[in-house]
Structure formats: structure tokens, C-alpha cells
Amino acid sequence: MTLNLADLRQRYLKDGLDENNTDDNPFVQFEKWFHQAQKSELLEPNAMVLSTVNEVNQPSTRTVLLKQFSDDGFVFFTNYRSQKAKDIQHNPKVALHFNWLELERQVKIQGVAAKISLKDSMRYFATRPKGSQIGAWVSHQSEVISSKQLLLSQFEKMKQKFQSGEIPFPDFWGGYMVVPQQIEFWQGGDNRLHDRICYTLKDNQWVKQRLAP
């Protein structure tokens, strides 16, 4: 079967991105765009694609949720026994990608991932809904399971076990911070003349440049 998508295209007609109107600090620029994405009521504006590479140089992507960001980096949480965690242990160089289609915007981040402190992971875990806390215990992420029903059954057992009192913190779960080395802001443009403003960290200083689309 062949599916021809040659005529499937979209014009980008929103305002362009002028480097003179972008902040010299990429984190400030990201915060500005992120708040605009929130105000636009996009579905999970904090959803980002995380790209990793395994021990045989096979790349993988998956969507995770940004839970914190600051001038230090971008934080997400996961099971430390998952495939993504194994990939990061092998090669901590990763990429993040935010795709805000309704705003005709993308943000691409290249950096290095490292585990955050146990204290910070525990603090965030305590804020999660009880069902999500139980889910962290039940799901042996990336492992083969016989059925969805088995997972639901295990969830109910854990729910009964922890029906009273706090749910303990799983030591195989926690956060990663991606410390960026390059951050690119992309704004769609008419006739495919897109705007690309790229910040690269050089000698502990952010260098801002315009890239050809």
C-alpha cells in the first residue's frame, strides 16, 4: 500500500520571530513561549519528546512531561529501570522537542541528562495523586507483560495495601534534569521561510544566532 501525501501541506501565517525581540537568555525566552502555550489552552503544553540512544546506537523517542524548569535545566520523572533510563546511563546526551502546532512553534533542546537529588525526587513524588503513586510501584516500565488485566489486578492489590497512610517512595523512580547546551526556537513562516533562533552555550555564555530554515 502506498499513501501519497504530496499535497498535504499547511501554510504558516502567524507573526514571525525577530531575533531582536527575543531575550538574550534562552530560559527567559522559553518561559515566555511556554506561558503563551499555556494561555492558548493547548493539550499538555508541557509534553515533550525525549530522544535517547542505546548501547548499539539505536535512537528512541517517547513523550514525557516537563515538570520543572529553571536556569539549571529541564526536569522530567520516570522509572530508573526503564529503557530511557538505561539509554541515559549508557549515553547521557539527549534531545528534547516541544511541538506547539497550534502556535506554529517548536523548541528543540540538546543537552546532557543527569539524575536529580533523592530529596527532590521524593518531594515531587509526594505531590502526585495517590493513583499515580501506586502506578509507579505497579508498572515495571518497558518490561513485557502478559495482559492489561494483570496490570489492573496488581494496581488493585497495591491500592488495598496502601489504602490507609502514605505510599512509600519507590527507590527505582525519580527525576532527571537535562542541562542544555543548545536551545533552538522555531516559528513557522510563509513559503517555508521559517524563523530559527538558536542559542548555543560557549564558554559559559549563550550565543544567539539566526539559522537558515
Swiss-Prot record:
Q: Which cofactor does it need?
A: FMN
Q: Keywords, A to Z?
A: Flavoprotein, FMN, Oxidoreductase, Pyridoxine biosynthesis
Q: Does the keyword Flavoprotein apply?
A: yes
Named from the GO MF annotations, one term is: FMN binding
Q: Give the catalytic activity.
A: pyridoxamine 5'-phosphate + O2 + H2O = pyridoxal 5'-phosphate + H2O2 + NH4(+); pyridoxine 5'-phosphate + O2 = pyridoxal 5'-phosphate + H2O2
The record's EC number reads 1.4.3.5
Give the GO biological process terms. Answer: pyridoxine biosynthetic process
**Keyword Oxidoreductase on this protein?**
yes
Name of the top EC class for this enzyme: oxidoreductase
Cofactor binding, per record = Binds 1 FMN per subunit.
So which domain of life are we looking at? Bacteria
Chain residues that bind substrate: R9, Q10, R11, Y12, K67, Y124, R128, S132, R192, L193, H194
Listed InterPro entries: Pyridox_Oxase (IPR000659), Pyridox_Oxase_CS (IPR019740), Pyridox_Oxase_N (IPR011576), Pyridoxamine_oxidase_dimer_C (IPR019576), Split_barrel_FMN-bd (IPR012349)
Record pathway: Cofactor metabolism; pyridoxal 5'-phosphate salvage; pyridoxal 5'-phosphate from pyridoxamine 5'-phosphate: step 1/1; Cofactor metabolism; pyridoxal 5'-phosphate salvage; pyridoxal 5'-phosphate from pyridoxine 5'-phosphate: step 1/1
Positions binding FMN in this chain are: R62, T63, V64, L65, L66, K67, F77, T78, K84, Q106, Q141, S142, W186, R196
Similarity comment: Belongs to the pyridoxamine 5'-phosphate oxidase family.
* Job description of the protein: Catalyzes the oxidation of either pyridoxine 5'-phosphate (PNP) or pyridoxamine 5'-phosphate (PMP) into pyridoxal 5'-phosphate (PLP).
Subunit architecture: Homodimer.
Which NCBIfam families does UniProt cross-reference here? pdxH (TIGR00558), PRK05679.1 (NF004231)
Quote the protein name from its UniProt record: Pyridoxine/pyridoxamine 5'-phosphate oxidase 2
Tell me what organism the protein belongs to. Answer: Hydrogenovibrio crunogenus (strain DSM 25203 / XCL-2)
